[in-house]
Amino acid sequence: MKIDITDYNHADEILNPQLWKEIEETLLKMPLHVKASDQASKVGSLIFDPVGTNQYIKDELVPKHWKNNIPIPKRFDFLGTDIDFGKRDTLVEVQFSNYPFLLNNTVRSELFHKSNMDIDEEGMKVAIIITKGHMFPASNSSLYYEQAQNQLNSLAEYNVFDVPIRLVGLIEDFETDIDIVSTTYADKRYSRTITKRDTVKGKVIDTNTPNTRRRKRGTIVTY
């Protein structure tokens, strides 16, 4: 895949280059993970697969000594149960859920930062939040990168948060052959049990025209 990034509060100056390299390399070599939708308006069409994407990232980072599912201290557990990944002073959240969850990630990252909470035997200094681009068809109301940019830009304009954040968007080029991992689950919406998984070629078709006023998501096809 390809990535786009937006930094807040000088994250580019604070982020450890080696830790970022491990994240970047993982994302750049990752294939696009898809599954068939079961939502009424797009039954059977291919959409972004958050479960497969999360698992790929986990399988790549844990062997590099990134901690996974780091428990949130009890005094802060009103904001959730755990952090996706962490290493040294860096926190990573993979956010493909509904768009309001970005604010939760931001607030708790701010709290962890200001309280100097230990991530991996070091106080937390910077957060990386990974999202998907708007170009990918996805489950209704799930967060996308451009939306996250708008939210964080507005918050940053009024100095709502001080924690350094690197926002990452997963993207691809339209109309270009790419590697795709297509997965079928035991239950299309909630299951993590894989019944079939294929690695194929495919592309994301641009469904926009020069006259399109509001950018539409692409269509994913495999062959």
Swiss-Prot record:
It catalyses: Endonucleolytic cleavage of DNA to give specific double-stranded fragments with terminal 5'-phosphates. Homodimer. The gene is bglIIR. It comes from Bacillus subtilis. GO terms for biological process: DNA restriction-modification system. This is Type II restriction enzyme BglII. It comes from the Bacteria. Its EC number is 3.1.21.4. The keyword Hydrolase applies. SUPFAM superfamilies: Restriction endonuclease-like. Binds 1 Mg(2+) ion per subunit. CDD domains: BglII-like.
